[in-house]
Design a protein with these regions (language model features):
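Aromatic-anchored segments of alpha-helical transmembrane domains
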Residues: 31-38, 102-104, 159-173, 210-223, ...
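Interfacial loop-to-helix transition and helix-capping segments at the boundaries
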Residues: 53-65, 123-137, 168-185, 199-202, ...
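Hydrophobic core of alpha-helical transmembrane segments in multi-pass integral membrane proteins
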Residues: 158-168, 207-221, 239-245, 296-312
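Juxtamembrane "helix-exit" motif on the non-cytosolic side of transmembrane helices
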Residues: 42-46, 111-116, 168-171, 218-225, ...
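Alpha-helical transmembrane segments and terminal signal-anchor/GPI-anchor hydrophobic tails
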Residues: 197-259, 274, 281-282, 289-292
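Specific transmembrane alpha-helix
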Residues: 65-78, 135-147, 174-200, 232-252, ...
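Membrane-interface junctions at the ends of membrane-embedded or membrane-associated helices
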Residues: 15-16, 79-86, 150-153, 192-205, ...
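Membrane-cytosol interface segments of multi-pass membrane proteins
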Residues: 1-161, 286-349
Length: 349
């Protein structure tokens, strides 16, 4: 049996159907990211985050970036099977390129008014993950590190990085956080290489109930709002509960928007923040009050902008160039086919 996530649903179904549950999970994680930034960016409108949203965002922390990283790890067997050269070109095209391009675009949006002297700290900060695009930078580093450790056993290496995360100072963005997330990445990779276990985990009601109990205990006893090894039980439990639910309903017509969001995750991720930021700045200039309404409008606008661009991407080379490197840098060395919805969805985060 091929050690890929495809074995979860079972043989006999097309490859696309076998990935539906993962697309749903990515969609859920992306919407959680959008809501988080719609709340945190209220500060640019001189407004406070509503307590209810603050609580929701805190509870959803393990369902945002950690879930996306875990899912990226699940796709590793398929990625590395392409060979080192195609693997590297694909990741640079689908992750490295949008990171650099949107770092520049975001810098152009954020920089006006700061003055030329601000460039001395702004440029290095942005290029080292000092913006919302840090996730893409970290993911690119994880893909590079995966080549180094690809011949080593996954779980022992993951354990080493969990120890490093525990030893690192708490809440350090470039120490504790990447070590913890890379451990999750390796854990997802290991699961993908054990399709029987993965199949059982996402199908078993008993496993889902046990995971829900662990998740509840984690929320009650641990700080789940931070990326660190102490959040590992709750993070894995939350991912399992969501995977169980997604697996059962993934092909529902009602979830088509979530699947679409998940398949085009890189588009929604890079687009949402600038849209929300600009709207918050405009709201501040207009003296708009009402944080709840502003969160709803800005999050809705960000998702709408992402949807429009995701729909346009397979039809427009110009739009496609906003998210994927030119064809000669792609994994196959050829431009993305115009009829491929969302381009190469399995290489996006």
């Amino acid at each position: 049996m091929s050690p890929t996530p495809g074995g979860v649903v079972g043989a006999g179904r097309p490859a696309q159907a076998r990935a539906d549950w993962m697309d749903v999970l990515r969609g859920v994680a992306l919407i959680a990211v959008v809501l988080f930034h719609a709340g945190t960016l209220l500060r640019f409108a001189d407004l406070q985050v509503p307590e209810g949203l603050r609580a929701v965002n805190g509870a959803a922390a393990p369902l945002r970036i950690p879930l996306l990283v875990l899912l990226s790890g699940l796709l590793m067997p398929r990625s590395v099977s392409k060979g080192v050269r195609r693997y590297a070109r694909g990741k640079l095209a689908a992750v490295g390129y949008p990171f650099l391009l949107w770092t520049v675009l975001y810098g152009l949006v954020y920089w006006p008014g700061l003055g030329v002297e601000a460039l001395a700290w702004l440029v290095p900060s942005l290029l080292t993950g000092g913006s919302y695009l840090w996730y893409l930078l970290f993911l690119l580093v994880f893909y590079a590190a995966a080549l180094v450790v690809r011949h080593l056993p996954r779980l022992p290496v993951a354990a080493v990085f969990l120890v490093l995360a525990e030893l690192a100072p708490d809440a350090t963005k470039h120490l504790e956080r990447p070590a913890f997330l890379f451990a999750l990445f390796l854990g997802g990779w290991w699961l993908a290489e054990h399709p029987g276990l993965l199949r059982t985990a996402v199908r078993s009601p008993l496993a889902a109930v046990a995971a829900a109990a662990v998740l509840g205990a984690s929320y009650a006893l641990l700080d789940m709002s931070r990326y660190g090894p102490r959040a590992l039980p709750g993070t894995l439990a939350g991912a399992l509960v969501l995977a169980f639910c997604a697996h059962r309903v993934a092909r529902s017509g009602l979830l088509r928007p979530l699947r679409f969001t998940g398949r085009n995750s890189v588009v929604f991720y890079v687009v949402h923040f600038p849209v929300i930021y600009v709207l918050m700045r405009c709201a501040d200039l207009a003296g708009v009050e009402g944080p709840v309404l502003l969160v709803v409008v800005s999050a809705g606008a960000a998702l709408a902008a992402g949807a429009v661009l995701a729909l346009a991407r397979p039809r427009s080379g110009l739009v496609r160039g906003l998210f994927t490197a030119p064809g000669r840098w792609s994994a196959s060395g050829a431009p993305v086919a115009a009829g491929a919805v969302g381009g190469p969805p399995r290489t996006s985060p």
